[in-house]
From Swiss-Prot:
Keyword Chaperone part of the UniProt annotation: no
Regions annotated as coiled coil: none
Induction annotation: Positively regulated by TnrA under nitrogen-limited conditions.
Gene Ontology CC annotation, any one: plasma membrane
Organism placement in taxonomy: Bacteria, Bacillati, Bacillota, Bacilli, Bacillales
Name of the protein in its database record: Oligopeptide transport system permease protein OppC
Gene Ontology MF terms: transmembrane transporter activity
Species name: Bacillus subtilis (strain 168)
Gene giving rise to this polypeptide: oppC
Family indicated by similarity: Belongs to the binding-protein-dependent transport system permease family. OppBC subfamily.
Amino acid sequence: MQNIPKNMFEPAAANAGDAEKISKKSLSLWKDAMLRFRSNKLAMVGLIIIVLIILMAIFAPMFSRYDYSTTNLLNADKPPSKDHWFGTDDLGRDIFVRTWVGARISIFIGVAAAVLDLLIGVIWGSISGFRGGRTDEIMMRIADILWAVPSLLMVILLMVVLPKGLFTIIIAMTITGWINMARIVRGQVLQLKNQEYVLASQTLGAKTSRLLFKHIVPNAMGSILVTMTLTVPTAIFTEAFLSYLGLGVPAPLASWGTMASDGLPALTYYPWRLFFPAGFICITMFGFNVVGDGLRDALDPKLRK
């Protein structure tokens, strides 16, 4: 082995400024959250599932020669085949087309209910948390009273009183659905309203609306987004349960809930009538739940590196 003389080496001079240098480029909260979300394989699987279901709901009925409401008693209760991929129901309607038309309605109900919960909950929770004092007490006691009533019971009562329809279901779900969002937003506002940048803006004369929707709510958007994502599968499941009770969307409209309700009595002899709508309810709920969990982990400041 060849010996290398020591005089060929020169010790590296320590630079005091090197300790102050940032070795890694700093990332914003959202960029860092996006990177960690993309590294979460289960969350990405859930996102792909949701995107595929939405695309199929939009385009699949367009390329089928069957209509979701056309009946043909000669083809009633046919098993899955090359002509009817998911089989037919008791009226001879193609279950494949009805499944994807039902996906439009079920997902629309879930997203619409989540958006209304977001709007009402953010406004209610923001005002309650920011005002504090007697205003906070009154607003949260009202929310507690509504929360004390079983939400499903209130939804069923409203569905009985109001005329059956798509928007009636959404309104009934929103009556108590916003309370959880309001509580979360209120907690975030109570933490953020005493931060230095909020106090500085308040000192400079910023209005309450600007303080809330310019400084406070955007910084609470992580928790809001996660809660909204987890609200969608709950609304889809609630619609399915209401359909089982006969309070779903009226015929000839199809949702996963109404299809599952119609297919349940025929489970023994025609299982495909229940299997496909119930299966997609489970898959969609799984997708939204794992995406919500992934967002929660990605936006958790304790996990930031």
